[in-house]
Amino acid sequence: MKRIAKAKNKFNIFIEEVPIPKISPTEVLIKSKYTLVSRGSEIWRRYVRPEAIQQKMMGYCLTGEVVETGSLVDSFSIGDKVAAVAPHSEYVSVDTADKKLTPSIVKLPDKVDLIEGIFWPLSTSA
């Protein structure tokens, strides 16, 4: 699968090939449909400044479809349309029991399409 990564120094953004994540019992695997690049926190703070940022931290707004669920996950099912705090990547694993980000993933209502849902993480902060 492909994901966006950042090397050291300014403006070094690239697409790299990495394995599809394996999920734990409390995680779901999402096949990404859309990710949102934030002008402030990503373009300026992460891409323009010279310090390296952890690759898993590249991105935080994603929508897609659940394609696999861990054995302890009962709140999401395969095929669910979701928005998540997750990086720019073709596939991402999201921990449904993560208490640091509450919630880090939500089901999108039928009336909300995946493009609209991409703004969910931004709409939760003020």
Explain the meaning of each model-derived region.
Residues W44-R49, T96-K100:
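Short, flexible, mixed-charge acidic loops at enzyme active sites
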Residues I20-V37, R45-H88:
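Glycine-rich beta-strand-centered segment in the early N-terminal region that forms part
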Residues N9, V67-L72, D95-D98:
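Short loop segments at secondary-structure junctions
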Residues M1-K2:
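Extreme N-terminal starter segment of soluble prokaryotic enzymes
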Residues A5-N12:
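Extracellular beta-rich ligand/substrate-recognition surface
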Residues S75-A126:
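NAD(P)H dinucleotide-binding glycine-rich loop of Rossmann-like/cofactor-binding domains
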